[in-house]
Swiss-Prot record:
Glycans are attached at residues 201, 247, 361, 390, 397, 681, 713, 762, 783. CDD domains: FN3. Interacts with SLIT2 and ENAH. Residues 533-553, 586-616, 711-801, 980-1012 are annotated as: Disordered. This is Roundabout homolog 4. GO terms for biological process: angiogenesis; blood vessel endothelial cell migration; establishment of endothelial barrier; negative regulation of blood vessel endothelial cell migration. GO terms for cellular component: external side of plasma membrane; membrane.
Length: 1012
């Protein structure tokens, strides 16, 4: 990615990363949850009790304990101590002094404990846990006493256990063994032992034992003796005694601490009869259930009085029947009358038993068992259920009527549910049961804890899950990442689309057009690198042209790399249109050839005045730079159609891949004349090593692309057949001062372009050995054909180098300074777009010089030449930029000239209106030719269709065959040429391949009669 990508990664990344960091941190935070709830504990022994509480959450929650709903103070570490993990240690206080003081101290730590975990996201409260302290004092409240009983009588042993928590249970032992109770004869009422109809075997030692979690306590041993009854006479006397029960009165209970005792009644009776009073009286009572009910068995209680006594062991809310019976020993008297007494109801003295909670389908089921019968204190009319207020459920109560012992509570949110149950009588609700709690976990937590138990998700559970902070944070992070990825993709697509825009700089790493159009075996190419030196070169320096082919020691090693890549073409590359590139380069090195005398039929060309010829070559026009070219000898005949067929249509012809663009200006031919060759010494051919100024070992005819630098792995351009060069005509003899350079375009009748009329230019001037003459073309570039390349061939083995004066003269010419020429306006052609530079074909200067020496009229070849004259104005800035490249080429510095030409084509002249002319002049100065842009089209077949220029035939006798080159041909030629020059040998051996190529290029000098 380019700088935009760097900016994206370097500038836009920190903000998303910071947001992800913050949101990720929030995603880890969670509200507190109670994992381990405290359990009921009992302080016993000397060790402390532990209330455990575990919670989870992020940040880690703070644990706080509450006692009976109030925050627990940690100011007394001897009673409470909080461990770092949240566990609460409860120490048992030391019991000293009176029991009353001990109870006050214990009440400070007894109660219901709850654990509260809180952080910045919320608070969680655990279920309540009750702390109990097991206490059992030493002293019994009532000790059993020694008793003497008579067989058949009732026996009561009273026992008051010591105070303790929990309330101690009382059991009786006889002779060191637990006493076996017998319903109806041996029963325990309260804490007292009652024996009805005592028997002889009931005698023994009885002991009361109190037991709770704190331990057990034993009372003193009481001795019981059962004696035989008195004489039978006493029994008969008792039958005459009459007992009248007068009153049964309910006694008010005395305020006592601890469990409330049952109700008591006061019985009063009256004895009548002749017999003596009885020794003892027994009270009998039973509960009355209904009139139709036969009633329960009577309960006998021995009274301690003779006319009145207190009777206990009753229950509130019951209807009782009372009566009194006298007795003396084993003798019993008749029973008294029966009195009815209804005891009022009281609140139940005991809570319901077995309270449980279980979760159901969106509800909690509460179930319980009735309290013990002796603690009903009336008729149980229903139950009251209280719910402790917490975060899950507010405080509420429900009433269950009748004997139902179950309640269903609807739940809305997960959490902790704690309930208490109390029995209700006519007097009200009794004692509450111990709080029982149930924790309802969420579905995910429950499934995680117990994977085997699958709980189906409901809509409420799904909503609760989606509302959790971690789920919301995770969703936000995923959404942000998705948006970030979409943004990056859009950015990359738009960034990649910039490289495919129109213009010259549209090259990518893999140019499919170049891959398809280049073949190492068919097309020559430029050297691998173009070395150029920074700065301009002195235009006055001169060197051999052979230095262009070798390494220039003045060029630095870090010079620019070639614009062309020699990477092999990738197979299977589709044929795509190329609407913004020039075509590739072809370099043909033409070997030197001896000068050939011009034909006497060649018409004389118009010459410049001697004052111009003596100093420098005149500037051609505002469309071109001063150049010196030699005319090539006649070419071998091979039309593009034949070349196309010979190559079996393997080359992608330029005319097939781009539309034919018509020129906007008339066709013009430029000609330069090196100088008069009328003198004898000039007409003679110099030696190979003479080194004369007029000698040129070779000429380079090249055509290459001027455009942006291609990627190194771009494939080679497709090779094209070289078109025939313009016809070389012979002028008058070298002694004739009037030399003419005439050239015309030859086109078949099928050519859509109109044929240019014959133009003969005549000019006279004094001959000079060093004079150079030029016939200037019109300011427009020619556009002969878009299907062939321009090739320039030398006729003379000379390469002239301009002097600084000549270059300066060319640059100083203005539009108003015209050379004396006879202008013949050529036939106008169809206009071409300004961006199309057309086909430029010029003869070499040496050829023009030969034609000037030949003199004479115009033969058959004259009709094929066209030399429209024009003035030579001062070049535009774009032309001046390109002139630097041409000047470098004149000084044997082809790499620098190439770099100058490319640098002048980097886009600075794209807005110049003279760009077409300047580029044509510069290209023509180097022997280059540019093809028009191809139209946007897509080739569907790998083989090119027939060229639309296939029928365009050039001269029947002068045409150029299809050149087949190897990619390393130029390097081999350079090495061979340099080695031969270093050894003093001719540039080309007679039997070498270069000679054959040279013969191809130069050919034989046509005779005067072959002009047709």
């Amino acid at each position: 990615m380019g700088s935009g990508g760097t900016g994206l990664l370097g500038t836009e990344w920190p903000l998303p990363l910071l947001l992800l960091f913050i949101m990720g941190g929030e995603a880890l935070d969670s509200p507190p949850q109670i994992l381990v709830h405290p359990q009921d504990q009992l302080l016993q022994g000397s060790g402390p009790a532990k209330m455990r509480c575990r919670s989870s959450g992020q940040p880690p929650p703070t644990i706080r304990w509450l006692l009976n709903g109030q925050p627990l103070s940690m100011a007394t570490p001897d009673l409470h101590y909080l461990l770092p993990d949240g566990t609460l240690l409860l120490h048992r206080p030391s019991v000293q002094g009176r029991p009353q003081d001990d109870q006050n101290i214990l009440s400070a730590i007894l109660g219901v404990y709850t654990c509260e975990a809180s952080n910045r996201l919320g608070t969680a409260v655990s279920r309540g846990a009750r702390l109990s302290v097991a206490v059992l004092q030493e002293d019994f409240q009532i000790q059993p006493r020694d008793t003497v009983a008579v067989v058949g009588e009732s026996l009561v042993l009273e026992c008051g256990p010591p105070w303790g928590y929990p309330k101690p249970s009382v059991s009786w032992w006889k002779d060191g063994k637990p006493l076996v109770l017998q319903p109806g004869r041996r029963t325990v009422s309260g804490d007292s032992l009652m024996v009805s109809r005592a028997e002889k075997n009931d005698s023994g030692t009885y002991m009361c034992m109190a037991t709770n979690n704190a331990g057990q306590r034993e009372s003193r041993a009481a001795r019981v003796s059962i004696q035989e009854s008195q004489d039978h006479k006493e029994h008969l006397e008792l039958l005459a005694v009459r007992i009248q029960l007068e009153n049964v009165t309910l006694l008010n209970p005395e305020p006592v601490k601890g469990p409330k005792p049952g109700p008591s009644v006061w019985l009063s009776w009256k004895v009548s009869g002749p017999a003596a009073p009885a020794e003892s009286y027994t009270a009998l009572f039973r509960t009355q259930r209904s009139p139709r009910d036969q009633g329960s068995p009577w309960t006998e209680v021995l009274l301690r009085g003779l006319q009145s006594a207190k009777l206990g062991g009753l229950h509130w809310g019951q209807d009782y029947e009372f009566k009194v019976r006298p007795s003396s020993g084993r003798a019993r008297g008749p029973d008294s009358n029966v009195l009815l007494l209804r005891l009022p109801e009281q609140v139940p003295s005991a809570p319901p038993q077995g309270v449980t909670l279980r979760s159901g389908n969106g509800s909690v089921f509460v179930s319980w068992a009735p309290p013990p019968a002796e603690s009903h204190n009336g008729v149980i009319r229903g139950y009251q259920v209280w719910s402790l207020g917490n975060a899950s459920l507010p405080a509420a109560n429900w009433t269950v009527v009748g004997e139902q012992t179950q309640l269903e509570i609807a739940t809305r949110l997960p959490g902790s549910y704690c309930v208490q149950v109390a029995a209700v009588t006519g007097a009200g609700a009794g004692e509450l049961s111990t709080p029982v709690c149930l924790l309802l976990e969420q579905a995910m937590e429950q499934s995680a804890r117990d994977p085997r138990k699958h709980v189906p998700w409901t809509l409420e559970q799904l909503r609760a899950t989606l509302r959790r902070p971690e789920v919301i944070a995770s969703s936000a992070v995923l959404l942000w990442l998705l948006l970030l990825g979409i943004t990056v993709c859009i950015y990359r697509r738009r960034k990649a689309g910039v490289h495919l825009g129109p213009g010259l700089y549209r090259y990518t790493s893999e140019d499919a057009i170049l891959k398809h159009r280049m073949d190492h075996s068919d097309s020559p190419w430029l050297a691998d690198t173009w070395r150029s030196t920074s700065g301009s070169r002195d235009l006055s320096s001169s060197s051999s042209l052979s230095s262009r082919l070798g390494l220039d020691p003045r060029d630095p090693l870090e010079g620019r790399r070639s614009l062309i890549s020699w990477d092999p073409r990738s197979p299977g590359v589709p044929l795509l249109p190329d609407t913004s590139t020039f075509y590739g380069s072809l370099i043909a090195e033409q070997p030197s050839s001896p000068p050939v005398r011009p034909s006497p039929k060649t018409p004389a060309a118009r010459r410049f005045p001697s004052k111009l010829a003596g100093t420098s070559s005149p500037w051609a026009s505002s469309d071109s730079l001063c150049s010196r070219r030699g005319l090539c000898s006649p070419r071998m005949s091979l039309t593009p159609t034949e070349a196309w067929k010979a190559k079996k249509k393997q080359e992608l012809h330029q005319a097939n891949s781009s539309p034919l663009l018509r020129g906007s200006h008339p066709m013009e031919i430029w000609a330069w004349e090196l100088g008069s060759r009328a003198s004898k010494n000039l007409s003679q051919s110099p030696g190979p090593n003479s080194g004369s100024p007029g000698e040129a070992p070779r000429a380079v005819v090249s055509w290459r692309a001027v455009g942006p630098q291609l990627h190194r792995n771009s494939s080679e351009l497709a090779s094209r057949p070289l078109p025939p060069t313009p016809l070389s005509l012979r002028g008058a003899s070298s002694h004739d001062p009037q030399s003419q350079c005439v050239e015309k375009l030859q086109a078949p009748s099928s050519d859509p372009l109109p044929a240019a009329p014959l133009s003969v230019l005549n000019s006279s001037r004094p001959s000079s050995p060093q004079a150079s003459f030029l016939s200037c073309p019109s300011p427009s570039s020619s556009n002969l054909s878009s299907s062939s390349l321009s090739s320039l061939e030398e006729e003379e083995d000379q390469d002239s180098v301009l002097t600084p004066e000549e270059v300066a003269l060319c640059l100083e010419l203005s539009d108003g300074e015209e050379t004396p020429t006879n202008s013949v306006s050529p036939m106008p052609r169809a206009p071409s777009p300004p961006t199309t530079y057309g086909y430029i074909s010029i003869p070499t200067c040496s050829g023009l010089a030969d034609m000037g020496r030949a003199g004479g009229g115009v033969g058959s070849e004259v009709g094929n030449l066209l030399y429209p004259p024009r003035p030579c104005p001062t070049p535009t800035p774009s032309e001046g930029s390109l002139a630097n490249g041409w000047g470098s080429a004149s000084e044997d510095n082809v790499p620098s000239a190439r770099a100058s030409l490319v640098s002048s084509s980097d886009g600075s002249f794209l807005a110049d209106t003279h760009f077409a002319r300047a580029l044509a002049v510069a290209v023509d100065s180097f022997g280059l030719s540019l093809d028009p842009r191809e139209a946007d089209c897509v080739f569907t077949d790998a083989s090119s269709p027939p060229s639309p220029r296939g029928d365009l035939s050039l001269t029947r006798s002068f045409s150029l065959p299809l050149w087949e080159w190897r990619p390393d041909w130029l390097e081999d030629a350079e090495i061979s040429h340099t080695q031969r020059l270093g050894r003093g040998l001719p540039p080309w051996p007679p039997d070498s391949r270069a000679s054959s190529q040279r013969s191809w290029l130069t050919g034989a000098v046509p005779k005067a009669g072959d002009s047709s």
